[in-house]
Swiss-Prot record:
Its EC number is 2.5.1.3. The lineage of its organism: Bacteria, Bacillati, Bacillota, Bacilli, Bacillales. This is Thiamine-phosphate synthase. Condenses 4-methyl-5-(beta-hydroxyethyl)thiazole monophosphate (THZ-P) and 2-methyl-4-amino-5-hydroxymethyl pyrimidine pyrophosphate (HMP-PP) to form thiamine monophosphate (TMP). SUPFAM superfamilies: Thiamin phosphate synthase. Gene3D superfamilies: Aldolase class I. The keyword Acetylation does not apply. Pfam families: TMP-TENI (PF02581). GO terms for biological process: thiamine biosynthetic process; thiamine diphosphate biosynthetic process. 4-amino-2-methyl-5-(diphosphooxymethyl)pyrimidine binds at Q44, F45, R46, E47, K48, N79, S117, K146. One of its GO terms (molecular function) is magnesium ion binding. GO terms for cellular component: cytoplasm. Keywords: Magnesium, Metal-binding, Thiamine biosynthesis, Transferase.
Length: 224
């Protein structure tokens, strides 16, 4: 296994869907399937918080979703659980600033994808130095999904990181919808992540497709 290239990582971040079983009232595996059919390019398994699965139920759910991702050929990333990622041979791990140490995580997972949440320029630089393949930056907009979210930043931090010549792949996080995604890409992000905008949508496939079309349109506009 070799480390993922930055160009490939940037493409995979385009429509970055995050979900746990407690983020939807529908069948969660079906929601992931529909999201991928609609254009999700990466999936992060985030099974935490009130009403989340534990133990064997959590493991079985993770395996089912991983199978869906494998069949579709998109990366399956696990949030903040290196042990589970290694056990399932996941494609990668995403950690927050209050989770595991990035350098220790990189050492533990080898060449798997490593994503790190960052809320200021110094955290981005530290993540890059520790071997992160991408950073998640935000919250860009107000969000209801993460009760412990940092202060809303808009797109200014993403712009500042790019102004400083930092080229690590970036995915925008927090309160992003298909209608407000364009400014995130225009600021310098390579993709956007979402939970409820797809997981709680009446039609997850259509919601994912709208994101996919908007991101494609925004990236095309930048390359002109």
């Amino acid at each position: 296994m070799t480390r993922i290239s930055r160009e490939m990582m940037k493409d995979m971040l385009s429509v970055y869907f995050i979900m746990g079983s407690n983020n939807t009232s529908a069948d969660p595996v079906s929601v992931v399937e529909k999201a991928i059919e609609g254009g999700a390019t990466l999936f992060q398994f985030r099974e935490k918080g009130s009403g989340s699965l534990t133990g064997e139920e959590r493991l079985l759910f993770a395996k089912r979703v991983q199978d869906v991702c494998r069949q579709a050929g998109i990366p399956f990333i696990i949030n903040d659980d290196v042990e589970l990622a290694l056990r399932l041979e996941a494609d990668g791990v995403h950690i927050g600033q209050d989770d595991a140490d990035a350098e220790e995580t990189r050492a533990a997972i080898g060449d798997m994808i490593l994503g790190v949440s960052a809320h200021n320029v110094s955290e981005v630089k530290r993540a890059e130095a520790a071997g992160a393949d991408y950073v998640g930056m935000g919250p860009v907009y107000p969000t209801e999904t993460k009760k412990d979210a940092e202060a809303v930043q808009g797109v200014t931090l993403i712009e500042e990181v790019r102004r400083q010549g930092i080229t690590i792949p970036i995915v925008g996080i927090g309160g992003i919808t298909a209608d407000n995604a364009a400014p995130v890409i225009e600021a310098g992000a390579d993709g956007v992540s979402m939970i409820s905008a797809i997981s709680q949508a009446e039609d997850p496939k259509a919601a994912a497709r709208k994101f996919s079309e908007e991101i494609r349109r925004s990236k095309a506009g930048l390359s002109r």
